[in-house]
Design a protein with these regions (language model features):
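N-terminal glycine-rich phosphate/pyrophosphate-binding loops that anchor nucleotide-derived ligands
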Residues: 1-62, 128, 135-142
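Glycine-rich anion-binding loops of enzyme active sites
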Residues: 25-40, 66-142
Length: 142
């Protein structure tokens, strides 16, 4: 992706990339934003929704954040039932709720292959952001 000028408020962006973007909105509050989606990895629609939601939210958690809300994104074949899609969405909604967040909307398109995921918005204190390039293995004695 082409590099672009970044505002000072963009604490984590493309260079170097990490699990999610982080944007400072107040001295003690930064927004964590991520998007993940992929084809189902299990046959159960509810489990697929829960797995997709957990995967997307894990990027917010990896940055040290808490989940606020999410938007679902799905690609759905016309030959699969709407009931299966609703079950998939229910799995995602339940998993986001379990993490303390809420699903606030989303978007669905017709495609040949099913895909599902979420854009997740979280919050973190700027002093508590966890970065991949700053991780250290804990030393253990004894």
């Amino acid at each position: 992706m082409q590099q672009q000028p970044s505002p000072a408020e963009l604490l984590v962006g493309l260079a170097p990339s990490d699990d999610a973007a982080v944007y400072l909105v107040a001295p003690d509050t930064a927004i964590v934003e991520t998007l993940d989606f992929f084809p189902p990895i299990v046959d159960d629609a509810y489990a697929s929704g829960a797995i997709g939601a957990a995967n997307a939210m894990s990027d917010v958690f990896a940055m040290g954040g808490e989940v606020l809300f999410a938007l679902q994104i799905a690609a759905w074949p016309e030959d699969l039932s709407m009931e299966q899609l609703e079950t998939l969405f229910r799995g995602g909604v339940d998993k986001v709720r379990e993490a303390g967040g809420v699903v606030a909307g989303g978007h669905t398109v017709i495609d040949r292959e099913p895909k599902y995921g979420l854009a997740v918005t979280g919050r973190v204190h700027p002093d508590r952001i966890l970065r991949k390039n700053a991780l250290r293995v804990a030393m253990r004695s004894g």
